Amino acid sequence: MEEKKALKDLNLINRFLFAEVMDDPEVNQDALSIILGQNIRLLSSPQTEKEHRVSPLAKSIRMDVFSVSEEGTVYDMEAQSTYQTDLQKRSRYYQSLMDSSLLEPRVDNYNQLNDSYIIVIADYDIFGLEKYCYTFKAMCEEHSSLPLRDGAVRIFLNTRGKNESEVSDELVEFLHYMENTTDKVASETGSERIQRIHERVNKAKRSEAVGMRFMREMEERNAARVEGRMEGRKEGRMEGRMEGRIEGRMEVRREDILKLLANLGDVPDNLTEQIQGQKDEDVLMNWLLLAAKAESIEDFASEIRK
C-alpha cells in the first residue's frame, strides 16, 4: 500500500500519476508495447478516468486509461497500489461494461465487437505464484487446446514477480520502474521506451498544472474523509457498519495469509492464533505481502518477529 506522498515522490504505480503520464499517446503506446511484446500504434489519444455507465441504476466504472489501437483493439490499463481482494471479479465487470459501449444499437453481427484487453498492474501478487504476468483467455474444459475466440484477454501484472526467465527483460524493468520511479532506476535500464516514459513522468512532476490537480484531488479526498467522520458522528449505526467493513477486510486478509502459508506446509497453531488475533489492518497488509514472498513458513515467522 503506497503511503501519502508529495507529487515529486510518487511512483508510477500511483493511480493519479499513472493517469497523468499515460494521457500522452506515445507513452501509452510504449507501455502497451512493453506489456504485450509487440509494437502498438494508437488510433487516437487515450482517455483517462473514462466513465462507463449502462443505466442510472447500475454501478458505473471509471477506467484509469482507455485507448484504441489502429487495428481497433481496445485497451484498459489500471494501476493498483492498494490491496484489493476483488480484482478478478472487478475485471469481469469492467469487461462487461466496456463491451456494452463498443457496438452501435443497430449492429446485429457480434463479430464486429472489438478485441479487448483489461490490464491490471499491481504492486502485489494477486495469485501468489510469484509470476510477473498472468494472462487469461477462455478455453474449453473438455478440450484444453480449444480456445473460445471471443477476443477478450485479461492480464494481471505483478511488480514483485520472480520468474525473470519467462518474461522479457524490458517488462521486468518496466514493472520494477512502476514501483521505483526514480532517476537512478531509469538510468539503469537499456530500454528507450522506459526512458521516454521517465521523461514524461519528470515533466508531469514539474508541471504546475499537474501539481494543482494533485493538490485538488488530495483536498477532495481529505474533505470526503472529514465529511465521512462527521456523518459517522451523526449516525452511530453508520459508524458501526464502517467498523464492520474494516473488520471484514481484516478477516479476509487473515484468511488470505493463512491460505498462502498453507501452500508452504502445515501452519503451527500458535502462528495461526497470532494471525487471527492481529487487529492492526496495516500489520495484516504487511504480513500478507510477506506471506506471498515467503519461501517457507519458518521464513515468514522469522520476518514477522523482526
Each PLM stretch: what is its role?
Residues M1-E208:
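Conserved single-residue anchors adjacent to enzymatic active/cofactor-binding motifs
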